[in-house]
């Protein structure tokens, strides 16, 4: 994952120090792009160990259209706890927008189901898009979408995905986002009868929080190991039928976890 370490180094050395909503302070750049060949391995960081269980369950939770943390907590995942209200609700965040975008006429649009249909029927379309950024719902969300808009592209029997992320917490969030959208691309490719292509990650405000500088330097001192591979149960042909047990990570040789505080 030299690609990720290059981002880390670029922001540390070339970024601009700014204030931010959380009050912590950041060093950031505006506009950065990474590309990962998904046939070369699963893009999960090896320079610090990541909690893959949280990544997989969060993605399945999004695909369920769920916006309450109860299901996540049932499966030992706490990454959304800081933002939930006393009943566990987060408002109309990712899952709701993906699966039940509210239309002005009262309908609810299942963007993911529409996407799957279009990939199969019109794979050359330039409208293979899902958006989580709904201006009408922002004030109702516990946290507005950071990874807000993604598009798929089919060529030579391969499925590629490009994500636009408006706000990119490089040390804590981005490693999760890379793995999550890489996995989503693999899942959609499988149920669509396609091979995987590239995952392209385009960042808007790419930032390191000021209390992550030391951890970032520590991570940059480590040498990346070979990427692992993700084995997905080939029997699953429906995107919404995937379970945690359908995924097996192979040859993940990661260095120790690096702890860092989260900015809420």
UniProtKB/Swiss-Prot annotation:
Coiled-coil spans in chain: none
InterPro entries: Thymidate_synth/dCMP_Mease, Thymidate_synth/dCMP_Mease_dom, Thymidate_synth/dCMP_Mease_sf, Thymidylate_synthase, Thymidylate_synthase_AS
Disulfide bonds: none
GO biological process: dTMP biosynthetic process; dTTP biosynthetic process; methylation
Keywords in alphabetical order: Cytoplasm, Methyltransferase, Nucleotide biosynthesis, Transferase
UniProt-annotated binding residues for (6R)-5,10-methylene-5,6,7,8-tetrahydrofolate: 51, 169, 263
Catalytic residues in the record: 146
Annotated Pfam families: Thymidylat_synt
Main location: cytoplasm
Reactions accelerated catalytically: dUMP + (6R)-5,10-methylene-5,6,7,8-tetrahydrofolate = 7,8-dihydrofolate + dTMP
GO molecular function: thymidylate synthase activity
Residue intervals passing through the bilayer: none
Annotated function: Catalyzes the reductive methylation of 2'-deoxyuridine-5'-monophosphate (dUMP) to 2'-deoxythymidine-5'-monophosphate (dTMP) while utilizing 5,10-methylenetetrahydrofolate (mTHF) as the methyl donor and reductant in the reaction, yielding dihydrofolate (DHF) as a by-product. This enzymatic reaction provides an intracellular de novo source of dTMP, an essential precursor for DNA biosynthesis.
UniProt subunit comment: Homodimer.
Annotated protein name in UniProt: Thymidylate synthase
Organism: Bartonella henselae (strain ATCC 49882 / DSM 28221 / CCUG 30454 / Houston 1)
Lineage: Bacteria, Pseudomonadati, Pseudomonadota, Alphaproteobacteria, Hyphomicrobiales
Recorded name of the encoding gene: thyA
């Amino acid at each position: 994952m030299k690609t990720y370490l290059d981002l880390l180094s670029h922001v540390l050395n070339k970024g601009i120090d700014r204030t931010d909503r959380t009050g912590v302070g950041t060093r950031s750049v505006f506009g950065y792009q990474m590309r990962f060949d998904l046939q070369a391995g699963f893009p999960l960081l090896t320079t610090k160990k990541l909690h893959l269980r949280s990544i997989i369950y969060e993605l399945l939770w999004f695909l369920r259209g769920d916006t309450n943390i109860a299901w996540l907590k049932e499966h030992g995942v706490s990454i959304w706890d800081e933002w939930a209200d006393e009943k566990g609700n987060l408002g109309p965040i990712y899952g709701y927008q993906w699966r039940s975008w509210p239309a002005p006429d009262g309908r609810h649009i299942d963007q993911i189901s529409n996407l799957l249909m279009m990939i199969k029927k019109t794979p050359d379309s330039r409208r293979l898009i899902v958006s989580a950024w709904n201006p009408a719902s922002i004030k109702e969300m516990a946290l507005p979408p950071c990874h807000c808009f993604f598009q798929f592209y089919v060529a030579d029997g391969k499925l590629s995905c490009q994500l636009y992320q408006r706000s990119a917490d490089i040390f804590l969030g981005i490693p999760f986002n890379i793995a999550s959208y890489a996995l989503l691309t693999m899942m959609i490719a499988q149920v669509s009868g396609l091979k995987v292509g590239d995952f392209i990650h385009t960042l808007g405000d790419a930032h390191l929080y000021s209390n992550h500088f030391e951890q970032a330097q520590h991570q940059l001192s480590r040498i990346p190991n070979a990427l692992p591979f993700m084995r997905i149960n080939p029997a699953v042909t429906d995107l919404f039928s995937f379970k945690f047990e359908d995924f097996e990570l192979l040859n993940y040789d990661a260095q120790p976890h690096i702890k860092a505080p989260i900015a809420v």
